[in-house]
UniProtKB/Swiss-Prot annotation:
Heterodimer of LeuC and LeuD. The keyword Amino-acid biosynthesis applies. GO terms for biological process: L-leucine biosynthetic process. It comes from the Archaea. This is 3-isopropylmalate dehydratase small subunit. It comes from Pyrobaculum calidifontis (strain DSM 21063 / JCM 11548 / VA1). PANTHER family: 3-ISOPROPYLMALATE DEHYDRATASE SMALL SUBUNIT 1, 3-ISOPROPYLMALATE DEHYDRATASE SMALL SUBUNIT 2-RELATED-RELATED. One of its GO terms (molecular function) is 3-isopropylmalate dehydratase activity. It holds the Pfam family Aconitase_C.
Amino acid sequence: MLIRGRAIVYGDKIDTDVIIPAKYLVYTDPAILGQHAMEPIDPEFPKKAKGAILVAGRAFGMGSSREQAAIALKGAGVLAVVAESFARIFYRNAINVGLPVLQAPGVRAKVREGDELEVDLTGGVVRNLTTGEAIQGKPLAGLPLEILKAGGLLQYLKNRA
């Protein structure tokens, strides 16, 4: 499963309160949530997110277990999130809502804002097409990959019914 897009880069410990502030949790529409994604640290994020790959450092998605964090990123048009490490609950929520995620230690230091990336989920490789570098991450396989291919957990379950 290959995903291509330009990089939007953030640092370590981006928590779910930053990804989608609590005051917007009253909304359920992914597009509305997406308009407010990353608002506390990057008010321009919604303009940059469509067709982008979000790259981050360690502990991306830490904090509360709000599913809306992954929904907001997907609603903003993010194609995938690649981080050095993830909070496990965010990682599972992302897969469950159909937002591709890949853990790739060292990725943050090798990608700059605007670089063109290709993410191979099954091989676990992030290719920086701008610099020619490849970063080996942890490949996705088994049920998590099948859920992503289906478009999320609900669609996966519907397909099996």
